[in-house]
């Protein structure tokens, strides 16, 4: 692997010409090297952005995510379903290497196989981040396992986030993965400001947070909430704050969870927790919310390593 190119293989093709005689080459100005064009899925994700060098030297160009409705245009905020995973896009697009970080949740394994065959046929290296060994959006793991059984053997190089994941990849597919831990997801200036506030704003309240956002298949808040409510109630000066999205907790929410909503309102009315119901938080509001907590409890059954965990780490929240 070549750290200077963001962890991608050295054997990525580049433009070159026939060797010139030594006496000519000595007097010839260095030819401009074509930048390495990387198609990353998704290109705007914080992990992918952190693969780039801090100082842009122009040696690597990362394509923007195409708009799913109009692939000729950059996607802006909406990148899913990813156009770059369509075999027809990979067959015609101008790029040197495809890096799949995540986003293949709904892609049939046969389509992924066709994609990898197109890449191999064009001589385009394929780098895969094994981001999830178990998909947090899937109740049943069969589809994700089948997708990985196509992608992992086909990849020219593998990246993963932890040594434990690398060991599992070695066990399941006999492949070695480069471990590149998840980078910070909160801007450095925001992290610094949060740490400074913590140093002088310590009060008598110990705030424990649980967030029941739009529920993934991997989330099971009711499995731990009764125990969490009882435990926090026994801690001197502790407050349990539960935040939830309107689509889960509002009476007309599109994904309302009736039993969860009823339990939370009952406990809030009894003074055993603070309940905050709101819409999706943008990054700034999310960082402020997490920084206000002493502990953030993750209600996951599987798929526990997430950007949420990394944000808490950066903001000093346990």
Question: Which positions does each model-derived feature cover?
Answer:
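Acidic donor-binding loop of glycosyltransferase active sites
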Residues: 288-304, 314-317
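Nucleotide-activated donor-binding/catalytic signature segment of Leloir-type glycosyltransferases, i.e.
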Residues: 246, 253-288, 295
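Donor nucleotide-sugar binding/catalytic pocket of nucleotide-sugar-dependent glycosyltransferases
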Residues: 153-170, 174-191, 203, 207
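Conserved donor-binding/catalytic core segment of Leloir-type glycosyltransferases
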Residues: 199-222, 229, 240-243
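Short N-terminal targeting/anchoring amphipathic segment
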Residues: 76-80, 87-110, 125-127, 298-299
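Nucleotide-sugar donor-binding and catalytic loop/hinge architecture
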Residues: 28-31, 191-209, 232-237
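Short beta-strand->alpha-helix junction loop in the catalytic core
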Residues: 68, 180-195, 214, 246-248
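Membrane-proximal helix-turn-helix segments that form the acceptor-binding/catalytic region
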Residues: 114-125, 141-157
